[in-house]
């Protein structure tokens, strides 16, 4: 069994906006031996008291940095830690622009980007960005197909249902051709999509036992697609505040037995009040997990 790669979730909703603290966090994660930094994505937050209520946890009061911009900064102050979106809400963004941003970041980071994508829940963001919330699941497959075309070919002729590229291309192309694309989400159409075209899956389930049915489905769908688990990644998250080392060990062992190739440690929601608290937490976990640079 391969060793599971351990990363951290950047705790941006609790971290503040001090660029020096952000630099210190990224450099600490790298020096402690974590394999990657994962960040969430929301472009805008809505007023929770608006007439049509939201269905998710975040509002305009929760700070989120733009992922590509934040990672460009982190790439400049680190050397080799992987930069992972978990996830970027792809259907609310312009596909060709995402291709350009991701390719540029991959070049500037020397091939360190892993792009996790998903559909999102915040319809307000879609409206504000001029995108259709209702057909986001239909559009995302074409988006992923086009991204890979743009990342691997100097010139692209593409005509789909929602996209057309008339013999044009990106320059520079990314270091990774193509950049790995992982999917979040857990609905059955998502699981089929993951198995059909994803490089990996980022489940929201906290425990491996809760994900068993979904993992079984992905296994069947991989078989149908002529693919194998050997070429597929699995990255759950571990909540730092939900237990101590004995509990951490159980959760990690169960996920690894279920096939997890990666795991991200999330220190948000643990009662920490300062950036230093979050940095101390990832230091503590690195010591427990035996990580080393």
Give the ranges of each region predicted by the language model:
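Active-site-adjacent structural elements that line small-molecule/cofactor binding pockets in enzymes
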Residues: 1-293
């Amino acid at each position: 069994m391969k060793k599971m790669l351990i990363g951290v979730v950047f705790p941006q909703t609790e971290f503040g906006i001090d660029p020096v603290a952000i630099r210190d966090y990224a450099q600490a994660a790298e020096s402690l031996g974590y394999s990657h930094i994962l960040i969430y994505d929301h472009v805008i937050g809505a007023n929770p008291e608006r007439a049509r209520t939201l269905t998710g946890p975040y509002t305009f009061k929760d700070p989120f940095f733009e992922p590509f911009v934040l990672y460009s900064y982190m790439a400049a102050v680190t050397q080799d830690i992987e930069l992972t979106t978990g996830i970027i809400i792809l259907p609310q963004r312009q596909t060709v622009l995402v291709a350009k941003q991701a390719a540029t970041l991959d070049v500037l980071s020397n091939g360190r980007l892993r792009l996790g994508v998903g559909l999102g829940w915040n319809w307000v963001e879609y409206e504000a960005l001029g995108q259709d919330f209702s057909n986001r699941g239909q559009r995302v497959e074409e988006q992923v197909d086009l991204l890979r075309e743009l990342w691997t070919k100097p010139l692209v002729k593409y005509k789909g249902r929602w996209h057309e590229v008339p013999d044009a291309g990106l320059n520079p192309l990314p270091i990774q051709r193509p950049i790995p694309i992982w999917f979040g989400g857990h609905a059955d159409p998502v699981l089929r999509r993951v198995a059909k075209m994803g490089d990996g899956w980022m489940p929201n389930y906290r425990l491996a036992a809760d994900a068993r049915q979904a993992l079984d489905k992905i296994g069947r769908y991989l078989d149908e697609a002529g693919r194998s688990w050997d070429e597929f990644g699995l990255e759950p998250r571990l909540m730092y505040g939900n237990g101590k080392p004995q509990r951490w060990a159980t959760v990690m062992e169960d996920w690894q037995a279920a096939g997890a190739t990666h795991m991200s440690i999330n220190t948000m929601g643990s009662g920490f009040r300062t950036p230093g608290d979050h940095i101390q937490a990832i230091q503590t976990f690195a010591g427990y997990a035996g990580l080393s640079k």
